A protein has these predicted regions:
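Soluble non-cytosolic domains of exported or imported proteins
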Residues: 23, 27, 86-90, 226-234, ...
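Short amphipathic alpha-helical segments at helix boundaries and their inter-helical linkers
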Residues: 258-275, 335-360, 449-453, 661-670
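Sequence context surrounding c-type heme c attachment/ligation sites in exported
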Residues: 18-93, 466-596, 600-604, 608-610, ...
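Active-site-adjacent structural elements in folded domains
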Residues: 221-226, 243, 294-301, 312, ...
Length: 672
């Protein structure tokens, strides 16, 4: 009887909690919709085929998707349109609070659009003017976090534990798409991912105790005679040093010792040894980056990462394995202060080698930022009279990028405007001669036609890099590798190219393509692609978004989808004019450009573009989007970049020695 009574009370409480707050709807939300929304979204007008007239306040009763869309548009500032009457912040906040509360009552996963703010493609929704406006009293860092290892770290470190074992399963996924891959919020370990990792751990454990294994203290655990308690303890210490990278605590030593003893009683000491190593290999500290912080919170409620946490954070920011230099510095007490960290990062970044491989994550930033390696994934037939080799194009472009990183001056501006590119040339290690510039392939003709070089053009190392005529090439965005990566199989893709400029250089936002939209451009050989695109995007409901992308992307109609410079398209002179607009930056807005070279020249001079570039570098190295609490970090990084004449090393040093990187909110503050 008591149980039935309690159950009835619980149902009543839940029902009360789930009831729609209709009073607040009629008092706050309905007048808001009437004032700011219904002029365009009533039953008669229905802009975007959306009517909010008579919408029910019952979010869970058939209106979930519509309310979720309204919340998203209001939350991200996309509605009302900028030229329409705007609600004040208090009005917007009140309506958002009501919708948020009703969405939460549905208990539907992903009901809140604000969850998207942790995803890399939504970083630009943080107000740029506020980030680079008035500085704050202090940095408010992210909460403590467990950051699942990216596949490259796992694939580099795990095989070494098993004496370079092969055949390990891939249990760690990476997100698809053109955004940064290693975002902490994007990954977790579930049962499906843990199963192959457990299989890997068993294989590695067996290899660590195999007869040909090097470590005697681990092999002692599987010899004929059962090990003594001290031998088990020594095996645990060795396993922790090799696998976790530290000595076990007293609690861990006792716990794993008891585990081995229980496993031995059940299956014998050999099986127990493998189970012991498998358990250590599956510890969260092995599969996650631990960034919890230590010590007493400061006056702002922040705690600093421990020296060991800093060492691993720096290692994985610049490399795909623990860097001995950072681990030693932590052990020697030389990562205790911000100045210590800055000095260590500065020393590590001093890489003047041709390949620029001391810190592979630096080059990887530019791969992921520009996304040019994707050219390898875009299938194309060979052009008439030419050759399309996307892998060669990517390698050629990376030779230029390596040069720019080694020079480390005006890095962004140079990458956006350079006319000097390599053609069939890359840095290679030559036996007994070291790294030298060598041909990518010996049988390369007529590969050079991708760069509009004549079929009889004479190739030579002494002619590298090739300086192209002014107006023909201008930076990475006019290189065939980037153009091919941001194209279709048979045509250019000015929409995606324009979106890249809007988001990666101008810091703007573009909504997702609405469900049900047919985004195909009609085929018509006698009409230029620019005009064919205009036919399908000119409608008002389409142009609202396409005006942010198309005027920026159509300048690249100067090139065909292979990346070759062209003067005619569909038998007509190419129109490569464009417009930089809707940026909120007076010196850029309304700027008409004659083609890609002029656009790149304008963008490369912009302080705003530099700041957006800094924001992307922040996301890459921090593994998260920036918040207003990171204002000081971003401004300091931009200052470092400018004062160093555009040094990416100085920018990286500033980020990795910042409070945003080294500090975490204390658990209490994070909870509050």
């Amino acid at each position: 009887m008591m149980l039935r009574c309690c159950f009835s009370i619980l149902i009543g409480v839940l029902s009360a909690q789930a009831a729609v707050d209709e009073a607040a709807f009629w008092k706050t939300v309905e007048p808001f919709l009437d004032t700011y929304c219904l002029k365009c979204h009533d039953n008669e007008t229905q802009k975007g085929k959306l009517s909010l007239e008579g919408i029910s306040p019952s979010v869970a009763d058939g209106n979930l998707e519509m309310w979720r869309m309204v919340f998203e548009r209001l939350h991200f500032g996309e509605m009302p349109p900028k030229k329409k009457k705007q609600p004040n912040p208090a009005e917007r906040a009140a309506v958002l609070a009501w919708i948020r509360g009703e969405l939460l009552k549905t208990q539907e996963p992903g009901a809140l659009a604000e969850e998207k703010l942790t995803e890399p493609q939504f970083g630009n929704y943080v107000d740029h003017t506020a980030l680079f406006g008035k500085r704050r009293s202090h940095v408010t860092p992210a909460p403590p976090r467990l950051w699942r290892l990216r596949p490259a770290i796992y694939n580099t470190t795990m095989p070494r534990l098993g004496e370079r074992i092969t055949g390990l399963a891939n249990g760690l996924n990476a997100v698809d798409g053109s955004d940064f891959k290693d975002f902490a919020a994007a990954y977790f370990l579930d049962e499906a991912a843990a199963a192959p990792l457990l299989g890997n751990a068993k294989k590695i454990a067996a290899a660590m105790t195999a007869p040909n294994a090097k470590d005697r203290s681990l092999k002692t655990l599987v010899v004929d005679a059962p090990p003594t308690a001290e031998q088990v303890a020594e095996g645990i210490r060795t396993a922790f040093r090799k696998i976790v990278g530290r000595a076990p605590t007293a609690e861990e030593l006792g716990r794993f010792g008891a585990f081995h003893q229980a496993a031995s009683a059940t299956g014998g000491h050999v099986a127990a040894a493998n189970a012991l190593l498998t358990a250590i290999l599956m510890q969260p500290e092995v599969l996650y980056r631990m960034e919890l912080g230590t010590g007493e919170p400061d006056e702002h409620g922040r705690v600093r990462l421990s020296p060991r946490e800093v060492a691993y954070a720096l290692s994985y920011a610049l490399d795909d394995r623990p860097v001995e230099m950072f681990l030693k510095a932590a052990a020697d007490g030389k990562l205790a202060t911000t100045e210590d960290v800055a000095a260590a990062v500065r020393e590590r970044l001093a890489d003047d080698t041709l390949l620029q491989e001391l810190n592979p994550r630096v080059l990887q930033f530019f791969r992921e930022y520009f996304h040019y390696p994707f050219a390898r994934e875009v299938f194309k037939d060979a052009p008439k009279g030419g050759k399309h080799e996307p892998d060669w194009l990517v390698r050629d472009l990376e030779t230029t990028v390596r040069d720019v990183l080694r020079a480390d001056k005006a890095v962004l501006s140079t990458l956006l405007t350079t006319r000097r590119f390599y053609v069939n040339a890359q840095y290679k290690s030559v036996k007994r001669k070291g790294v030298q510039l060598q041909p990518t392939h010996t049988k390369w003709w007529p590969y050079q036609t991708a760069f509009n070089l004549a079929p009889d053009w004479r190739w030579g190392l002494d002619r590298q890099p090739v300086e192209f005529p002014e107006g023909e090439r201008a930076g990475v965005l006019t290189h065939p590798a980037w153009l091919a990566a941001w194209s279709g199989n048979f045509d250019n893709h000015p929409v995606q190219r324009g979106k890249w400029i809007r988001t990666h250089l101008l810091g703007g936002t573009v909504p997702d393509v609405p469900i049900g939209v047919d985004a195909r451009v009609p085929d018509a050989e006698h009409i230029t692609f620019r005009n064919r695109l205009k036919q399908v995007t000119a409608a008002a409901e389409c142009w609202r978004c396409h005006r942010k992308m198309d005027p920026l992307g159509v300048v690249f109609e100067r090139y065909d989808h292979y990346g070759r410079y062209q003067r005619r398209d569909a038998g007509q002179p190419v129109d490569a004019t464009g417009l930089i607009d809707r940026t909120g930056v007076p010196e850029l807005d309304g700027k008409h450009v004659s083609g890609p070279a002029e656009m790149m020249a304008e963008l490369s001079k912009s302080t705003h573009v530099e700041q957006v570039f800094v924001r992307h570098a922040f996301r890459y190295f921090m593994g998260r989007n920036e918040t207003l609490g990171d204002t000081n970090t971003l401004q300091a990084a931009h200052d470092a970049y400018r004062k160093s004449s555009g040094s990416f090393r100085a920018l990286t040093e500033s980020l990795l020695a910042s409070d945003s990187f080294l500090m975490r909110q204390s658990p209490k503050q994070a909870k509050d």
